[in-house]
Design a protein with these regions (language model features):
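Conserved anion-binding
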Residues: 130-137, 144-174
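Alpha/beta catalytic barrel-like cores
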Residues: 1-136
């Protein structure tokens, strides 16, 4: 039987509601959110402050009604500070997007972060998005599998839950 550490259990409780359900609000979009807001207000009227304020307001108003919020620190730093103190925090740990010139949509972690640093910033868990095509070349799949193994080892070392967000795609369709 698999066992969960006390630290992970306590963090999972912080992320869960009274029924043991993780009812999380996800607003960790970065590049796509910036593009949507630029389109909505127009290039000439757009500023990054609008993105920061949007995430702050959403966090401030909605974290009273959810058990956890998923935010990125890059654009969501104000939202992290504005969240309800009873709401758990899941922080994005991957770089946004992928290099379209490199086959495989390989995952990359934020270069200046670690799970230990996310914990120090108040995270109860981390999230990593991984693009996955099971029919891709074995060399690419091996890189992704090794990436996830290293991520699991790091999570075990600092006793933090990590959620993997798999995005399944077909590399033959662009």
């Amino acid at each position: 039987m698999k066992r969960i550490s006390r630290g992970k259990f306590e963090k999972m409780q912080q992320l869960s509601n009274d029924h043991g359900v993780i009812a999380a609000l996800a607003i960790d979009q970065r590049g796509s959110m910036k593009k949507m807001m630029q389109t909505a207000v127009g290039e000439e009227k757009f500023s990054m402050d609008q993105v920061y304020e949007f995430k702050e307001l959403v966090s401030q108003e909605l974290t009273k009604h959810v058990s956890a919020i998923l935010l990125d620190e890059q654009y969501g730093f104000k939202g992290i500070k504005a969240k309800d103190p009873n709401c758990g925090l899941i922080m994005s740990y991957e770089k946004t997007g992928y290099d379209a010139n490199t086959p495989g949509r390989l995952p990359e972690l934020l270069p200046d972060e670690s799970l230990d640093r996310l914990l120090a910033k108040g995270a109860d868990a981390a999230k990593v998005l991984v693009y996955y095509d099971p029919d891709e070349a074995q060399e690419i799949l091996d890189v992704k599998h090794a990436f996830l193994e290293r991520l699991g080892t790091e999570a075990l070392a600092v006793d933090i839950p990590v959620f993997v967000e798999p995005i399944v795609y077909d590399s033959k369709i662009t």
